[in-house]
Structures are given as C-alpha cells and as structure tokens.
Amino acid sequence: MSDNSQKKVIVGMSGGVDSSVSAYLLQQQGYQVEGLFMKNWEEDDNEEYCTAAEDLADAQAVCDKLGIHLHTINFAAEYWDNVFEYFLEEYKAGRTPNPDILCNKEIKFKAFLEFADEVLDADFIAMGHYVRRTFPTAEEIANGIKPQMLRGLDSNKDQSYFLYTLSSEQVARSLFPVGELEKPEVRRIAEEQGLITAKKKDSTGICFIGERKFTEFLGKYLPAQPGNIETPEGKVIGQHQGLMYHTLGQRKGLHIGGTKGGGGNEDPWFVGEKDLKRNVLIAVQGKDHPLLKSQGLLASQLHWVDRTPIKAPLSCTVKTRYRQTDIPCTIIPVDDENIKVIFDEPQIAVTPGQSAVFYLDEVCLGGGIIEERI
C-alpha cells in the first residue's frame, strides 16, 4: 500500500452518512483528512425544510468524533449565478432540467476544488458519491492513459449519472471511498464507529435546496401560467397551473383521473407533450401511447470525461434519467457539439432538458443535454 501520510484530502462534509464514512475511510487509509462544509442556499433559512444548521451540526459532530478539522464555506452566490438561474431559465422554456448535475459541475467539483486548492492546499478532494475511478500508474499516465469514472459498486445507489460532466483531470483529483461499498455496509461502518449520522435518512429533493413542495417552491420564482389540458384530438379535459410543473410521461398531478377517453377508454392519463406556443398540455391514455415513445434523441452541450469527442458511430448504452435500466443504443456524431442517438428499442418519456449519459460496460463516457426526441 502506498504511503498517503503526506497527502491532504479535503472531504465535502454534508452532514450525511456517506460523507461521514468517506472521511473515516480516508483516515484509515492514512491520509491527512480535513472536512469542508458548503452552504449554498440562503433564500429561506428560517423555513422548516431548510436543514443547513442541523447538517452543519452533524458534520461538526462527526469531525469532532474523528478528530479532524472542519472548515466552512458559503457558495450561495456561485450556486445562484451558475446553477439556480439556469434551472429557472430551463423551466421557463418548458424543459425539465437536472440541477444536481449542474451543481456537481459548478459547485462541488469546481468552486469546491478551487477553494480546496487555493486556500487549503489540498492534494485531493473527496465526496460521498457512489462512483468509482481508475488509478493509472505513472507509466500509464506517461503514455496518455487518463483516469476513468466507473459506476458505483452498489448499482442501486450508483451516482455516475450525476457526475458525467467531470473531466478526467477532475476525476484524477477526486476520491470516492464509498463508491467501493454497498449502502448497508456504509451504514454498518458508521454505526460501528459511533458516528451520529449512522441512521440519518438520505436527502432527496433539489440539490442543496432540500425537500419541499416543488410547485409551491417554483411558484416563488416563476409566475404560474394556467392553460388547458387537451387530448391529441383537441378536446379540453382539464386545466393545468403551468407547463413548468409537468414533465413528459408524468401521471400524477394532472387531476383528470376518471375522465374517459374516446370510446369510453378508462386507461390512466399521462403527459404526452407540451405545446409551448399555445400553453397547452397534451394528455394521452396508456403508457404505450405513440406520443410517449421515442426512437432516439438529439443531444447537445456534450461533455466527454476524457475530453475526446466521438468521431464515428459507437454502440454503447445510455440512461436518459437516474436509476433507469441501461438502454442499448448507437451514438451518431453530427458534429463536435451535437449527436444523434438511436435506441435499439423505442423508449418512453425521453425528456428535453434532462441529460443523456453514456456507458461502455462499467465506464461512464460522458453525456449531453437532450434537445429533442426523435
């Protein structure tokens, strides 16, 4: 085992069990470990779903238990400028963005890494993400071999989908200790070590904004624009409060349950399309409706982990949303900025604004933003 005692790692301490165990494991591996807690949202600190104070207290308790120093940093301005404004613009345009991916790109692996470098003199940063990475030898690096990002060992928790915007240079500076473990093992280690976060539930909801009623939250920043819900034939069957509150393939929240379709069809209703020009939500019946199906997609804002654009058709797999089963597909380059993706089998609810992330077996190649379905 290599001597890590001269290498400093700054761990992103979120106040959760994954970052807590990451810090412990790195300590056990001999690194000089320090923690850094990020505060990235200040709009409604006093509301009941803001857990920043509790999370900081838990992070501090874990660091005290492990005997490591905890730094704090406020990235709220960077989060607003580089993540949240994009999030709002995409919703305004009728698309469904994924702010967690942008948060990883702009905050956790950019602003955080820069602060860890410039202020804390870090050799590495570490996060509690469920991904793995390769460690090329010095000889391999000299021959141009770059670190690769791999899926997490726990397929149910794998978070590589959210990290596809990392470059191989960022991967080289990052450690992911829990990526080599399954979640129950992480909780077991936390309990064995007496860490306060051992039984703390996993956070869900928008990155750094927490768990809250999404419609109510979005309505604080974007004015609602109610309109009709129609069938593909143009029959008005209900009202929506705003296209931004709905995503393709959505079933819940349409409030048209019990409405029968043509010929007395009682199949459930799904969001099939958004007509932005008319501010109309098109609802269809049955998850196999043709409007829900796509043969492929067009993607832009491409990012490849090794920074090498794909120049020729490539057979691989793709995820168009988190925790989706891999979809066999072929990537067809249009140019360095755009690709066409053809699925082996038609897919349901491919959503513009979301990310398409590509894999070759365990390796995450990168991805792009879905512009349209085809």
From Swiss-Prot:
Highest taxon in the source lineage: Bacteria
The alphabetical list of record keywords is: ATP-binding, Cytoplasm, Disulfide bond, Nucleotide-binding, RNA-binding, Transferase, tRNA processing, tRNA-binding
Region (Interaction with tRNA) residue ranges read 157-159, 321-322
User: Looking at the record, which segments are called Interaction with target base in tRNA?
Assistant: 98-100
Quote the subcellular location field of this record.
Answer: Cytoplasm
InterPro entries listed in its UniProt record:
MnmA-like, MnmA-like_C, MnmA-like_central, MnmA-like_central_sf, Rossmann-like_a/b/a_fold
Residue positions binding ATP: 12-19, 38, 128
One example of the protein's molecular function in GO is: tRNA-uridine 2-sulfurtransferase activity
- Per the UniProt record, the site (Interaction with tRNA) maps to 129, 354
Q: Which SUPFAM superfamilies match?
A: Adenine nucleotide alpha hydrolases-like (SSF52402)
**Entries under CDD domains matching the protein:** MnmA_TRMU-like
User: Is the keyword Disulfide bond assigned to this protein?
Assistant: yes
Q: What's an example Gene Ontology biological process for this entry?
A: tRNA wobble position uridine thiolation
Asked if Amino-acid biosynthesis is a keyword of the record, the answer is no
EC class, as a word, reads transferase
GO CC annotation:
cytoplasm
Catalysed reaction per UniProt? Answer: S-sulfanyl-L-cysteinyl-[protein] + uridine(34) in tRNA + AH2 + ATP = 2-thiouridine(34) in tRNA + L-cysteinyl-[protein] + A + AMP + diphosphate + H(+)
- The catalytic site is made up of 103, 207
Coiled coil spans: none
Disulfide-bonded cysteines: 103-207
Q: What is its EC number?
A: 2.8.1.13
Please describe what this protein does. Catalyzes the 2-thiolation of uridine at the wobble position (U34) of tRNA, leading to the formation of s(2)U34.
Family per record: Belongs to the MnmA/TRMU family.
Q: What is this protein called?
A: tRNA-specific 2-thiouridylase MnmA
Q: Which organism is it from?
A: Aliivibrio fischeri (strain ATCC 700601 / ES114) (Vibrio fischeri)
